């Protein structure tokens, strides 16, 4: 059974997640186009935090993404919300689409399902952020073109491919090894269906 978390624990989780997200965002800085990180290490968190921390994790990821957009990519605060929306898209799709069995039953079928969800959510999120930043540049809100002279398709393929490999390699291992311990500590949220079921009981 997944326990209900106290407000204090939820706030602590949100703060911790935001800090970790911002730190990994900073670690992505070497792989940057002007104002945009090709290498996006926070995808690791977006692949596991939905199941681990639920709403608290989502809030932390959106805050950390905004901080990273402003201080790492040097995007103006009035445009850095794009980073938060991207985190929301990827986090939300993973939270909704990852089946519970993908974590509990370690079979090839469940691993494939998990990887398919990662591939879909990351593609949607990557395509969104590139489109949104390109659009903001075209209407004069963003001062620089993140494509840096490359075509949209090339930047999308490079960004998506690089980060998908990272997510597919790291996230399943983290889910398999860390999840049992988090459950024993009472901080595991489960997928969206599990979270809703828990909320209905209280």
Task: Enumerate the predicted regions with their spans.
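Extended hydrophobic/Leu-rich segments
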Residues: 1, 64, 171-174
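Hydrophobic transmembrane alpha-helices
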Residues: 1-59
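Lipid-exposed faces of alpha-helical membrane segments in multi-pass integral membrane proteins
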Residues: 12, 16, 20-23, 63, ...
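Residues within alpha-helical transmembrane segments of multi-pass membrane proteins, especially transporters
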Residues: 20, 44, 48, 52, ...
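Membrane-embedded alpha-helical hairpins and interfacial helices in multi-pass inner-membrane proteins
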Residues: 26-41, 73-202
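Central hydrophobic cores of alpha-helical transmembrane segments
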Residues: 57-69, 114-118
């Amino acid at each position: 059974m997944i326990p209900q978390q106290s407000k204090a624990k939820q706030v602590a989780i949100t703060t911790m997640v935001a800090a970790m997200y911002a730190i990994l965002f900073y670690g992505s800085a070497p792989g940057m186009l002007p104002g945009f990180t090709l290498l996006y290490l926070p995808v690791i968190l977006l692949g596991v935090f939905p199941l681990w921390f639920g709403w608290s994790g989502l809030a932390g990821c959106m805050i950390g993404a905004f901080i990273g957009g402003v201080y790492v990519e040097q995007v103006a605060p009035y445009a850095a919300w794009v980073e938060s929306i991207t985190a929301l898209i990827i986090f939300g799709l993973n939270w909704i689409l990852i089946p519970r069995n993908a974590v509990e039953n370690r079979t090839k079928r469940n691993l494939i399902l998990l990887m398919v969800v990662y591939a879909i959510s990351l593609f949607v999120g990557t395509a969104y952020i590139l489109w949104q930043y390109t659009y903001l540049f075209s209407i004069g809100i963003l001062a620089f073109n993140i494509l840096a002279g490359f075509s949209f398709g090339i930047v999308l393929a490079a960004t998506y491919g690089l980060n998908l490999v990272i997510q597919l390699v790291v996230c399943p291992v983290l889910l398999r090894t860390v999840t049992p311990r988090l459950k024993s500590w009472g901080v595991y949220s489960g997928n969206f269906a599990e979270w809703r079921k828990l909320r209905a009981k209280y």
